[in-house]
Amino acid sequence: MPIAHEHPRALGVLAAAALAAAWPALALSAPLAYPGETEGDFVVEDFRFQDGETLPSLRLHYTTLGMPRHDAAGEVDNAVLLLHGTSSTSKQYFGPTMGPELFGPGQPLDASRYYVIIPDGLGRGGSSKPSDGLHARFPRYGYGDVVNAQHLLVTRKLGLGHLRAVVGTSMGGMQAWMWAERYPDFVDAVMPIACQPIAISGRNLLFRHILTQAIRNDPDWQEGEYRSPPRHWLYTAPLWPMMLESAARLQSEAPTRPAALELYHRMVENARRSYDANDFLYWVESSFDYDPQPDLAKVKARVLAVNFADDAINPAELTLIAKLVASVPGARFVLVPAGEGTLGHQTLSLAAVWKPYLEELLRSTTPAGR
């Protein structure tokens, strides 16, 4: 059964600070520096995608915090992989409502105690993506390819044979489920946030399909080989932040007709500044290979899944997730109730809401043991 958790009303202050997370162009203040903070690029030669296509050189950008700690056998026992959402990058975890709540002294992933790995997912940020120059000739990738690239980073570049935990939000949460299934003996604990272990369908698929079809049918798209950015699809782009925000938050932001129309135009402009049409198309369509439900029996890691009651992408009335999580031995599902301190799907940007569950998960597991 889902377990509701009442979180402090003070989180309403944090909610305002996190609103910009839905749009990369609305940059947050400069992030703090954490112990051992390092950025790097991992290059894979002749990366093979699951459909058979290859890329001569695939780049995966990543950030690490802290230092590896070795156990008596010489194995690293404090590595945690953090995975971001669809329209984000590793920078998602360094805003004021995330980084200090996660990596600061005494926090769940205190960078003086944990070795934290945060990659830019394939197709995003500093990692290889269509807008680098290949445009629509960039190989079609799915979540399976994204996870494969992450695994190569962790094992080949960083030399790790084990992860203490995989934690992800939205798309990153879905990929956390995939990690638990694909590499069941590699991970101690998994925390998927704001997602479900089922194929993209229903309203979740419909709004994604509307956006991708708007791009594909934009007369300026030119089959992905456009010389100037397509413009027409942008008028549907507000669907994205609308689905990320709660109804209460949107009503508060736009309580009148003029305010709502002004918000709409601001969303269109933010999309124009933030997104390349090909990159966005690939982001959304990469989710269509996601379907962990048939392989949930393979999961050995301790799982603590967290969703939010006012999340329009993962509606609370769809109770399948509680049943599916219950089918995984030792797994637990938490449904955080809606309140002053929640933002719908974007509550994932408020680490203060979900970090108590991360603390619980890490306490309930030990390195290389469950």
Residue ranges of predicted features:
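Conserved hydrolase catalytic core segment
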Residues: 162-202
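Conserved alpha/beta-hydrolase "acid-adjacent" motif
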Residues: 312-319
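Catalytic active-site module of serine/aspartate enzymes centered on a nucleophile-bearing elbow/loop
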Residues: 330-370
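Conserved acidic catalytic loop of the alpha/beta-hydrolase fold
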Residues: 144-164
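Alpha/beta-hydrolase-fold enzymes
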Residues: 186-270
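Catalytic-loop region of hydrolases
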Residues: 27-80, 90-91, 96, 367-370
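Short beta-strand/loop motif that positions the catalytic acidic residue
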Residues: 299, 305-307
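N-terminal cap/lid subdomain of alpha/beta-hydrolase-fold enzymes
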Residues: 63-132
